[in-house]
C-alpha cells in the first residue's frame, strides 16, 4: 500500500512512518519542518533501513500538493499536518484556523479528485473541551472547545465527516488522543519542539 503521511517528520507522523515502513508499505511524506526537523527523516531510515519519498512544502501550496497526488498512486492518507500548540493558538487564532482548516480542505479535495478513499486523521482530545464525564470514551459528546487549536481540530473532523457523508466510499478514521509522550525504543525519535 502507498500511504501519504502529511506531517510525517513530526513526533506522531515519524512514528507512523516507522510502523508503515516496517510493515512494508511505501511511504510518502509531505512536511515543511515547521514542527519538526530534517534529521528526523534520517532517523526513520536508521530505524527501518528504508527511505520515505519526501516532499518539503506546506500543504497550503495546493499546486504542489496536487503534484504529489498526480505523481503517486496513493492508497491512503494519514493527516498529521497541523499547527499544534494550544497556547500559541490563543495568540494566533487566524494563523491556526487558516493553516489547519485549509490544509484539511486541500487534502480532502485532492483525495476526491484522485480517488483516494482512506484517511486517518490525527485529531485531539481537545475536541471534547471541558468534559462532563471522565474518563472519556468514544461515545462522549464533543464539548465547547476551550482554545482555537481544539476548535480547529473539531472543525477539521467535521470537514472530513461531511466529505465522508457525501462520498460513502470514503473511509474516515478520527484519532482523538491526549498529549503523546515518550520516545521510540531506538531513542532516535521523540518529542523535540
Where are these regions (language model features)?
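Short, intrinsically disordered, charge-balanced linker/junction segments flanking boundaries
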Residues: 190-193
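N-terminal Rossmann-like NAD(P)+-binding domain of SDR-like oxidoreductases, especially those catalyzing
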Residues: 1-185
Amino acid at each position: 500500500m502507498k500511504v501519504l503521511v502529511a506531517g510525517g517528520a513530526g513526533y506522531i507522523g515519524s512514528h507512523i512512518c516507522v510502523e508503515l515502513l516496517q510493515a512494508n508499505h511505501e511511504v510518502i511524506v509531505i512536511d515543511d519542518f515547521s514542527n519538526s526537523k530534517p534529521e528526523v527523516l534520517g532517523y526513520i531510515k536508521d530505524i527501518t533501513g528504508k527511505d520515505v519519498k519526501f516532499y518539503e512544502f506546506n500543504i497550503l501550496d495546493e499546486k504542489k500538493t496536487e503534484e504529489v497526488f498526480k505523481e503517486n498512486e496513493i492508497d491512503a492518507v494519514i493527516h498529521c499536518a497541523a499547527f499544534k500548540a494550544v497556547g500559541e493558538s490563543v495568540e494566533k487564532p487566524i494563523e491556526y484556523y487558516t493553516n489547519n482548516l485549509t490544509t484539511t480542505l486541500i487534502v480532502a479535495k485532492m483525495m476526491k479528485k484522485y480517488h483516494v478513499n482512506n484517511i486517518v486523521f490525527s485529531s485531539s482530545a481537545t475536541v471534547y473541551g471541558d468534559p462532563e464525564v471522565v474518563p472519556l470514551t468514544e461515545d462522549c459528546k464533543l464539548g465547547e472547545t476551550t482554545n482555537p487549536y481544539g476548535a480547529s481540530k473539531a472543525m477539521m473532523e467535521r470537514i472530513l465527516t461531511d466529505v465522508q457523508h457525501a462520498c460513502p466510499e470514503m473511509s474516515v478514521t478520527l484519532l482523538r488522543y491526549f498529549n503523546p509522550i515518550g520516545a521510540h525504543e531506538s531513542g532516535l525519535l521523540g518529542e523535540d519542539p
